[in-house]
Design a protein with these regions (language model features):
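Short amphipathic alpha-helix adjacent to the substrate-entry channel of hydrolases
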Residues: 1-15
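Short beta-to-alpha linker loops that shape the active-site pocket of alpha/beta-hydrolase fold enzymes
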Residues: 18-22, 82-83, 133
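Gly/Ser-rich "nucleophile elbow"/oxyanion-hole loop immediately N-terminal to the catalytic nucleophile
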Residues: 23-58, 68-73
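Short beta-strand immediately N-terminal to the catalytic nucleophile in serine-hydrolase-like folds
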Residues: 53-55, 80, 98
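Hydrolases whose catalytic domains are alpha/beta-hydrolase-1, hotdog thioesterase
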Residues: 62-66
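A conserved short beta-strand
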Residues: 73-83
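Conserved serine/cysteine hydrolase catalytic core
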Residues: 84-92
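C-terminal catalytic histidine-bearing segment of alpha/beta-hydrolase fold enzymes
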Residues: 94, 98, 104, 108-157
Length: 157
């Protein structure tokens, strides 16, 4: 698992759903994720101002999607090796993208361009760019994702 070991210093509750059918943007997946969030928030004492969304690969694409579509549910987004939206017009949420220059499945360029677009718009947007890691070496993204912890703590101040 990537998120648990990388984000352990947050002392957070980590929820890691699987997509139904491979596309996070379907109504079925959106309903399932929002219901899961509602359930977890009802069961645990969670500060709703400190809920981040993160995911790897297709989960990274889902991170971009849920952060864009449900900004009231999340305070930050950390997509890892995920395809960003075509545009980030109107985006306000802090985002830290983790991506490899050597990703042969999800190219680096679109994520880099989206982060630059967000920065130009004044959004708290950062990128952790790594090299020498292919898309399929999930666990090798752990150290890069761990670097998001101080950033996230700063966002949550």
């Amino acid at each position: 698992m990537l998120a648990g070991p990388a984000l352990v210093d947050l002392g957070a509750i980590i929820v890691a759903p699987d997509s139904l059918g491979g596309d996070w943007s379907t109504a079925e997946n959106e309903k399932a994720v929002i219901a899961l969030l509602d359930d977890v928030q009802a069961r645990y004492a969670i500060d709703k101002a400190k809920v981040a969304v993160t995911g790897y690969s297709m989960g990274g694409a889902g991170t971009w999607h849920f952060a864009e579509k449900y900004p009231q549910r999340f305070s930050a987004a950390i997509p890892v090796a995920g395809r960003p939206p075509a545009s980030a017009a109107g985006w306000k949420m802090p985002v830290l993208a983790v991506h490899s220059h050597d990703d042969q499945v999800v190219p680096f360029g679109p994520a880099e361009a989206r982060i630059a677009e967000l920065q130009k718009a004044g959004v708290n947007a950062k990128m952790i760019a790594v090299s020498g890691i292919s898309h399929y070496e999930t666990s090798r993204f752990r150290d890069a994702l761990k670097q998001s912890v101080p950033w996230l703590k700063e966002v949550w101040k």
